[in-house]
From Swiss-Prot:
GO MF terms held by the record: zinc ion binding
Binding sites annotated in the UniProt record for Zn(2+) 2: C124, C127, H145, C149
Natural source organism: Homo sapiens
ZnF (MYND-type) intervals: 105-149
Chain sites annotated for binding Zn(2+) 1: C105, C108, C133, C137
Name this polypeptide is given: Putative protein MSS51 homolog, mitochondrial
Annotated Gene3D superfamilies: 6.10.140.2220
Keyword set, alphabetical order: Metal-binding, Zinc, Zinc-finger
Keyword Kinase belongs to the record: no
Amino acid sequence: MAPRSRRRRHKKPPSSVAPIIMAPTTIVTPVPLTPSKPGPSIDTLGFFSLDDNVPGLSQLILQKLNMKSYEEYKLVVDGGTPVSGFGFRCPQEMFQRMEDTFRFCAHCRALPSGLSDSKVLRHCKRCRNVYYCGPECQKSDWPAHRRVCQELRLVAVDRLMEWLLVTGDFVLPSGPWPWPPEAVQDWDSWFSMKGLHLDATLDAVLVSHAVTTLWASVGRPRPDPDVLQGSLKRLLTDVLSRPLTLGLGLRALGIDVRRTGGSTVHVVGASHVETFLTRPGDYDELGYMFPGHLGLRVVMVGVDVATGFSQSTSTSPLEPGTIQLSAHRGLYHDFWEEQVETGQTHHPDLVAAFHPGFHSSPDLMEAWLPTLLLLRDYKIPTLITVYSHQELVSSLQILVELDTHITAFGSNPFMSLKPEQVYSSPNKQPVYCSAYYIMFLGSSCQLDNRQLEEKVDGGI
């Protein structure tokens, strides 16, 4: 167990609770806005790291969003009212300003403000995603860009189509699985199960007024229907990857979801992105993965949890078939002391961390260490996902050094199929959310460093 003084370093006062019911099968409760959040924020670190590759990029983003500081940006993201003139007069202005945040030379990293009067940033005509300040930079950059140009074309389309999720014009198709759950092992079998019904649903979205308005507002030609349908499918996998990956963990770790009173999953280090667009029905798919379950609680814990998402500390039994979403702002080891140890919330059957990033920063590793030790010492079944094979290797090495008992790792059959562009390094190979997973349970890892290297090098 982590030393108590270390684990209590980031204490914060408990928040108030106001439970409500948002849907017949999904219970959700709003979390009040808190003025400050403890510990390092991966969202904040990520924002300011943009300047490492493109000096001044963070300020360009704030400028295009009509904001004066990152604090004001976070205030708006957290549901507050900005002090300056944030907002857009029309959709065309919004999309243009969003696109302007990507305008810098991919080769020399020049921003618009640093160009001479004779130069202007123009995008690659193939992917419409990467900009150059002139033919010389574009020609010099082509050997690097050609490897990712096609994928970045998909990124550019997805970035616009994702707006349909924000507005609610693309509602994820859902319903009980017509196939036995054990027959659905990956996206191929999931899409086969959904079949023509899913295609009809996506086609209805494509002919909607919302899609017509979207592409009329962005100032570029509308792609072909098959391109747009492919984008909707990628967006669908991006949203459903998290609940289905949780299901993968419950399956692989042999957790009984038919226990009286329901089962509990804690999502640790939950980010703003994970919670901001999450809607009550998004986790229904997790329930359909386990027909006959007696209730599933999904509690998201993190310093960047979206304001207004949810918070609940109820220990009441769930109704069979119910999925309860809730959240808590703060670090997990503090949440454990304040909520779990005091009996205010349920002990987890599974803990999951999507892209914890503890391998990437000493500050993040320091914040994660008490939680990782807690999970190890309490022998809590734990699932971690990462973006890439490189992150997998680095994370495995850290977990081995912490003497965790790694039970499984590999490629995630329910990874997101939506490519993610590295914002400030656009020609870096795009990554995919939850591309790989690691599972561990307790201590005394059975793989030493040499065995681990052999397993990783042998292919996953």
